[in-house]
Every structure is written in structure tokens, then in C-alpha cells.
Amino acid sequence: SLTMKPVKKLSDITSSKSDRIITGINEFDRVMGGGIVKDSITIITARPGAGKSTLLLQVAHSIAHKGHKVVYASGEESDSQIKNRADRILNNISDNIWVLQETSMDNVVHATRDIDPDLIIIDSIQTFTMENALPARAGSPTQTMECANELLRLAKDDKRPRAVIIVGQMTKADELAGLRALEHLVDTVLIIEANSDEELRGLISSKNRFGSTGETGFFQMTEKGMESIDNPSEYFMTKREDGDLVSGST
């Protein structure tokens, strides 16, 4: 039989402050509302090549050095490809990052139980499938939602809450449809936009249950990854002085 939870008066409920993981990547933390909420699920979308995987590898690296375990599950790149990028953009790689080259969400769940991470990164959601889902190819709205619901259960587990960040590729029409459905499910939606300036990236929060929407953080894509532009005014002023005007900076 179903167990009904007690009905409470709103005035009797004790409000709780969100428990967050601070990454130390200033613009990322600011756009997120002060860091990653521990029982949250976030989707980050962009066109291919915008820097999603690079930024999240930096996020994983940063919090791993603060003692948090991270599972980075990739259905797009091999573990050696991920290691090559890490060697290029990171220093002193932490032992707290586990890389899983996988397209089975069921196997990700098993790995999560074994490793017990604080953060799970899925790159990208369109490459994963669930065995018990209706027959459909990876990237279809059906598979995308089944995988996302499984990740939601992991994130919102009362006994062991975890943060989950999902990468979503903006490519085919049906994959975009799956992402739009995901926006209603997740807590936070982040979009990376590449400007006319080849180096400049904007990280925008179009939805955030734990912070302000419409926040924009600025990054510069360099050989060492996505560098947080902690003083955008100074950055844009320098660009103007150099005669290299940036669209959207006026």
C-alpha cells in the first residue's frame, strides 16, 4: 500500500539553505548561484566545439582537488582522448576523478554505487541508452528522458544526494526536442554561446531553481582551457583599445 506523507502548513515548514560545492571557477560559480547544489541536476548545452567538455573537465578537476569524488562518463570520447585533453589543460590530475567510457546508463548507475561520487558528469546524454526503455536509438527523446529520469533518481536520493551535470548537444532536430523536454526536468539549464570573437565564450543560465536566471559568465578559450574572465569590463575595454570590438560588449 502507498504511504502518504503528512500534509504540512507552509508556515510550519523550516526552510533549508542549499548545500553547495564551490568549484573555485569564479564565473561558473556565480552563474550557478554560488556553486553546484549537491542534490541538483544541471544540463549544459551548446553547439559542438563550444567548450562544454573542456569546461566540465576543469570543474571535475577543481572539485576533485577539494576532496570530492567525480565520475566522468563519456559516450563520445575514449578514455585516452579525455586523458590527452586533461594533460593539456590541467596540472596535477587528482585521483578523485574516475573516467567511464560508456553508453549504457545502467552501467553508469552500477559504477556510481561502487565509487560513491559527489558529482556525476554525463557527456553527452544523447549517446546513452537504458536497457528497460522502449526500443529507440540513442539520442531519441524516449531514450534521453529515460536516462535523465534515472539520473534524477540518483541526484535526489535522500540518503545520498549527488550533483549531476548533463551535456546536451545542439545538433539534430529530434535531439533538440529531447533537450527541450529535459529543460522541464532539470534544476538548472546552462548555455554556452560562442561570440564573433573566436576566444570569447558566454555561459548563460536560462533556468536556475537555486539562483538568478539570465546571469552571464564570460570565459576565454585558451590552450589551457576555458579561463574565467573575472573582470569582464576590463577585458572588453582592452579589446576596444586594441581595436578588436566584441559583439555584445557595448
Regions found by a protein language model. Name each.
Residues 2-92, 109, 113, 244-250:
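The Walker A/P-loop phosphate-binding site
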Residues 69-70, 96, 163:
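Residues at the starts of beta-strands that form the adenosine-phosphate
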Residues 39-43, 48, 54-55, 92, ...:
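P-loop NTPase motor core
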Residues 1-10, 113-119, 126-128, 185, ...:
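Conserved P-loop NTPase
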Residues 59, 85, 176-179, 202-205, ...:
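Short beta-alpha junctions and helix-cap segments that line functional grooves
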Residues 75, 97-101:
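Glycine- and other small-residue-rich loops at beta-strand/loop junctions that grip anionic moieties
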